[in-house]
Amino acid sequence: MVGCGVAVLCLWVSCGAAAGQLEYSVPEETERGVAVGNLSADLRLPAAAMSSRNFRFLSSHRELYFGVDLPSGNLVVREPADREQLCRAKAACVLTYDLVLEDPLELHKIRIHVLDTNDNSPLFPAGDVQLHIPEFLTPGARFTLPNAQDDDEGSNGILSYSLSPSQHFRLDMGSRVDGSEYPELVLEKALDREQRATHLLVLTARDGGLPARSGDAQVTIIVVDTNDNAPVFERSVYRTKVPETAPNGTVLFRVQALDPDEGSNGEVQYSLSNSTQAELRHRFHVHPKSGEVQVAASLGPPETLLEAYIEARDEGVFGLASTAKLLVEVTDVNDHAPELDFLTLSNPVPEDAAPGTVIALFSVKDEDLDSNGRVICGMSSAGPFQLTASFDNYYSLLIDGPLDREQISEYQVLITASDSGSPPLSTRRTITVSVADVNDNTPNFPQPQQELFVAENNGPGASLGRVFAQDPDLGKNGLVSYELLDVISEGPSASSLLAVESSSGAITAKTSFDFEQLRGFHFQVEGRDGGIPPRSATVTINLFVVDRNDNYPVILFPLPRNGSVPVEIVPRSARTGHLVTKVVAEDADSGSNAWLSYHISRASDSSLFRISANIGELRTARLVLPTDAVKQRVVVVVRDHGDPPLSSSVTLGVLLSNSVPQLLPDFEDVWEPGGQLSAQNLYLVIALACISFLFLGCLLFFVCTKLHQSPGCCAQSCCRSTEDLRYGSKMVSNPCMTSATIDVTTVERLSQTYLYRASLGLGSDNNSLLLRGEYNAADLRNLATGVGLNLPISCIQIRNRKGDHANVNAMPRQPNPDWRYSASLRAGMHSSVHLEEAGILRAGPGGPDQQWPTVSSATPEPEAGEVSPPVGAGVNSNSWTFKYGPGNPKQSGPGELPDKFIIPGSPAIISIRQEPTNSQIDKSDFITFGKKEETKKKKKKKKGNKTQEKKEKGNSTTDNSDQ
């Protein structure tokens, strides 16, 4: 509460200058900091003097509700004061403080009156009120209600009470001896518990404050019952009929009377009234609680009407009672039940039977008399049936509506025949009516159109799906067979692609589907039942072929021509990002299976080129350096995004040149590393070549020196011409040599030449020839003769030696099928060659000799052996052709070696060396260098079975690229 203005009630000063008393007033709950009065002004002291005179403010209360603001000299509120808490029930609430000043000493009393505010609402200490008022009280009765309390004083206290509206009660104020008032509840209208047992009222107390406050209490009035109602029967007269033979204890009926009173006033007991004749009282028994009326003795002869009275009385202090009449008619005993006799019964009934069709005809009879012999016939069934009386005691069971076997195949018809006796007797007969099936339902497919998804590349006979039609008919009428209708699809007929199993509806494929050729089609399947006449329905099936990743990407550009590598020319001044070419490819698949990406799988210089992964543009990744090789090869792989992915590749040749050459170089050689690596290889080749020439010169000089110094050397053998030394030598001084071996060895790629080396060892006492492989006697003679060694068979020793050389066979072999003659292989090969591929040994008609394969024109001869071009070579490309047999072979001398050794399958070196067992070693190395000549490819169509090929000079090469 905020009090802004403070009234000074009284101000005086007593005891002269030594003492004084000040009084102030302030409303309760005033907020902190509000000024109550100005002490400085009231004491006639400046505000500064209060501090200088050691001003002290003393209080007897625990809490300091008020204080002095020294700068202004005001008396201010420190804590809000609650009058109800400080003074409780006191009429006046005053707080006293002492004010002490020194120099001179002064003592002042301060009295602060805390004024009441309306901050409390009226409150009923007892809470809600509950009153029990009997319903027999008359109007005017008074009932005291509790007072409300309000902690406020004066006009803020309670001034008035009020009551919620009620037609039975009003509020009045009563006075006590001391003059205080209290509220009273006055009964205005009599209460009736049976109408309303509880009344709810609200008592409100309101004070006189501004604004006014109020408090409520709920007054619950419970009406106490009194026995003011008599029991009432449901009926005033109860009538019944009882057979004369009813046994004792038979319940005739149950009576019931209701009393609206409460408790014992509403509890009812039953008994026979005193108004009942004495001779009838022993024939009936009434149960006092349930009100059942039972037979206690024989009721007498038939057709007798007995009259009795039943009394119902409550258990109140003054019990109230009421009576009801009982009329009991004794009737004849109905001891015969009706009888049913069926004359005709049709079962089963076809479901297409027309309404009015007679199912059964029967008669009824009862041997009782009068009403006991009158029979009433009824029927109970869930089916469309009707029971009709034909004539006297004859009934017909008819069809009253359509039958549907698919919904209900069997009905239970209950026929009841009851007489009119009391109680009536009846006979029940249940007839089972079966409904025979008729073909009245057409096969039904769940959907008129269905979709079928089939993955391509399925195997013939694979199951694709199943069609199913429902026919609710029975037996053959519901047995559906399926047939493929070949009337809808365009293009190939559906019957050529599919088959439908007639009994199960299973759809199988006759062929394998290809998404790229056939993406989908539609067809119809007919479902026909076995009824007479049959019914049918069709379903349209849309078959969709689902794509699989079964097609490799096809590169459209660039394409190799005649098996050569496509070449692009890039100026050496090209900047970074220069477009070299664009690889164009397509994929016959669809979706992600046809989404292609490009990347470089191999390149002569991986840092020189880059390719766009999405569009396939091959561009330079950096500037062309002077050290970059002129010829660059790039392998671009095109890969789709299927699962698993498929890919294709193309090899591109890139010529780094500022001008267009008249003749494009060959890009089919070995992969060359670019940049600094190529220059290093060039220096290495030059160094190796120099060292090789120096070594061979020294070796040749050493061999010649040894030959001249050999003691067993004749002039003829030592003075051979250079041509003789080049191809071989004849040994005459010793019939047996220490060892003779024939090795086929490859050399490093030094230049575009072949190296043939023959090494012979002399002067050994071990007369044996060492060969690798297995030979017969004829082969050994041919071998000895072929290498120019006149040795007897006894001087030849066969020894198997582990190594990479294979056995020598007499038959020629075809070239290696995996060999590709590229430009890179014209310089040499890093491989080992089988001995048997170096030459063919055969015994001619003139004696043992050796026929070496030579490069010759491929003129076909009837008895000549011919070696076809290597695998991978083109038809018109240069190839190796070998001729074997007696077709004009070039005979070699016994001491000569052929001038050229041609090895089918791979270029190689044939070396013939003899190794003595002693430390004396004589070696003669013969080195020849022959240039290979490259020729252009020539195409020539074949007519007939065989054609002749043009002769080529030198060693021929192929133009297939090694990818």
From Swiss-Prot:
Pfam families: Cadherin, Cadherin_2, Cadherin_C_2, Cadherin_tail. Residues 19-683 are extracellular. It is found in: Cell membrane. Residues 812-907 are annotated as: 4 X 4 AA repeats of P-X-X-P. Residues 705-963 are cytoplasmic. It comes from Homo sapiens. The chain crosses the membrane at residues 684-704. One of its GO terms (cellular component) is plasma membrane. Residues 844-963 are annotated as: Disordered. Its main location: membrane. It comes from the Eukaryota. PXXP repeats lie at residues 812-815, 845-848, 886-889, 904-907. This is Protocadherin alpha-C1. Keywords: Calcium, Cell adhesion, Cell membrane, Glycoprotein, Membrane, Repeat, Signal, Transmembrane, Transmembrane helix. GO terms for molecular function: calcium ion binding. Residues 1-18 form the signal peptide. Glycans are attached at residues 38, 248, 274, 562. Coiled coil: none annotated. The keyword Transferase does not apply. The gene is PCDHAC1.
